[in-house]
Regions:
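Active-site and donor-binding regions of nucleotide-sugar-utilizing enzymes
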Residues: 31-189
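Membrane-proximal basic amphipathic "stem/tether" segments
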Residues: 1-36
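Short active-site oxyanion
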Residues: 50-55, 151-156, 241, 266-269, ...
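Structural alpha-helical scaffold elements that stabilize or flank donor/cofactor-binding regions
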Residues: 85-88, 108, 149, 205, ...
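Donor nucleotide-activated moiety binding/catalytic core segment of transferases
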Residues: 76-90, 248-279, 283-284, 295, ...
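A short, charged/proline- and glycine-enriched loop
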Residues: 22-31, 52, 112, 207-210, ...
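Catalytic binding pocket for nucleotide-activated donors in carbohydrate/polymer assembly enzymes
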Residues: 276-328
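Conserved catalytic-core segment of nucleotide-activated headgroup transferases in glycan assembly
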Residues: 39-47, 169-170, 180-253, 317
Length: 328
């Protein structure tokens, strides 16, 4: 059924390609597809003052932030609005994306259009793309669909050679596609005194002592996302306040509303698993612990790369009790 729905969806996009085939590309029009705000907001903020016509396709949660930019055209994400999305994309000179968007596999890109990927991570510890164990490489139709989406990308923003290696393996990217500019999501950290801002945030939120944040990666099923018992954690470690934020795709109401970058600044220690946020923490010179209760299962189902496997066991905890002991 899922494959049938995808086939129908791609058929609609091909039909829309025909409708907007003659729509001219506007040299100052940029479309930004926003799933992870922290990855593309710095791009919006940099481009807006330069007079570009910017269209953002994103979640309703981001509309309020974008209202400060009076001339930005906001289109809510969702399959019901695919007609408006393709219309906007058909006239864009540059399209900026931050993750995998199925529609790009069916979009008929015009010769003078460029798609730039600013992947939603400072690095990678898990497999993704064609190296993800969930991708059945023997299924030619599945692999072909993934490749159509990956091949739509012209350029990748990267912050270091390890991600070049990952993109080559996962997306079959080539050397000429990499823009070694660094990542927009890291720019805000370079513009502030992190220690000073950490103290300001602790005061703002009424937090005394140390802060531990728990920021696990995406898992396919919500029931597989184990949360840390906040009461038990703080009773065992009274000098700590624990804040949790799950991956945006599986977020719950039981987590903090503080935005991710503020949490990273607030933190004295980052608890993650296979998430790239541990790499981001190193840029902030903050220690990380890896709570990897399902390491064997995750390796089997999704796959963990050589960078994860190089992490010493001393930094890994497989139970909540072990995690607490390592923090004492």
């Amino acid at each position: 059924m899922r494959q049938l729905i995808k086939k129908l969806y791609m058929g609609i996009i091909r039909f829309l390609n025909l409708i907007y085939k003659k729509k001219k590309v506007q040299s100052k029009h940029i479309v930004i597809m926003m799933t992870f705000a922290e990855d593309v907001c710095p791009i919006v903020e940099a481009l807006y003052p330069k007079g570009y016509a910017i269209t953002v396709i994103g979640n309703e949660a981001n509309r309020k932030y974008l209202q400060q930019f009076e001339t930005i055209n906001f289109l809510p994400a969702g399959n019901k609005r695919v007609f408006k999305h393709i219309k906007a994309l058909s006239s864009a000179k540059v399209i900026v994306i931050d993750t995998y968007y199925l529609m790009l596999g069916g979009l008929k890109k015009k010769p003078n259009q460029t798609i730039i990927q600013t992947w939603h991570a400072a690095g990678a510890l898990k497999q993704f793309g064609l190296t993800d164990h969930q991708v059945d490489l023997s299924n030619a139709k599945m692999v072909s669909q993934y490749r159509k989406v990956y091949n739509a990308t012209d350029k990748y923003l990267v912050g270091g050679e390890p991600m070049v290696e990952c993109f080559k393996a996962s997306f079959e990217a080539t050397d000429d596609q990499f823009l070694r500019t660094g990542l927009p999501r890291l720019v805000p950290y370079t513009r502030l005194d992190v220690v000073k801002r950490q103290n300001e945030l602790k005061k703002q939120y009424g937090i005394e002592g140390k802060v531990a944040i728990y920021v696990p990666t995406y898992r396919e099923h919500k029931q597989a996302n184990r949360q840390i018992d906040k009461s038990q954690f703080e009773a065992a470690l009274p000098e700590y306040t624990l804040l949790s934020k799950l991956h945006p795709s599986i977020a719950t109401e039981d987590q903090t509303a503080i935005n991710l970058q503020s949490m990273m600044i607030l933190a004295d220690v980052i608890i993650s698993d296979y998430s790239s946020l541990a790499i981001e923490a190193s840029i902030l010179d903050k220690p990380s612990l890896f709570y990897v209760y399902d390491e064997a299962q995750y390796e089997e189902e999704r796959g963990l790369n050589t960078f994860y496997k190089a992490i010493p066991e001393a930094y890994k905890a497989y139970t909540e009790t072990e995690l607490i002991e390592k923090l004492k």
